[in-house]
Amino acid sequence: MPDWSQDDDVMPEGFQLLPEVLDTERRQALIAELSGLPAGAAGQRELLDQPWCQALAGWLHDLPALQPHLAPDAVAVQCTLFEKSPERNWLVTPHQDLAIPVASRVDHAALRGWSIKGGRHFVLAPAEVLARMLAVRLHLDDATQADGGLRFVLGSHRDGVLDEAALRRWREHAADVAVDARAGDALLMRPLVLHASSKASAHGRRRVLHFLFGPRELPFGLRWQIG
């Protein structure tokens, strides 16, 4: 298994593993916070409404290891809890993360793919916005391939938003790399990098807090929906 833990300020593969970002005490405190969420909270995108999550986002933003990868004006715009378990298990085919949460719909020829999820507006972001964004996945449990961890297509973020033909070319001709993360690790990734995951075959839980950071200002009159 390759070692993806070495920091790289240009993130050429489109992702970077940072080991042991959370110590045991902080990780257990976060697990305790999650235990107080209502049933069915996994998959919800509004965790930044919670004060503890806002504080965690600020702590992440200021981590020295993240500074080379964040836009100078980066703000946290979303946090989602993903949880795989024997009762809640799924696979995800290779894809890019293209939708962003915004405060309201804006009619502009450059904007498409509008949707409403959980009562909030989402739009397919312009490529120049996505290129400046960073996702930070905080692992509260191990996320090996047996736990349904992520696989990446190396360097695929460099081609911007991919159409179906380009996606097939990348899948056929570029390396697909599995990343095993341990509890407490942080996995950084560009939303434009092709990534996928399989169903978990292990019997434990795989809880991940998926933070999204983006530039403070958006084009075309868009504004972030923070939360």
Locate the predicted segments by residue.
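Glycine- and charge-enriched low-complexity intrinsically disordered segments
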Residues: 226-227
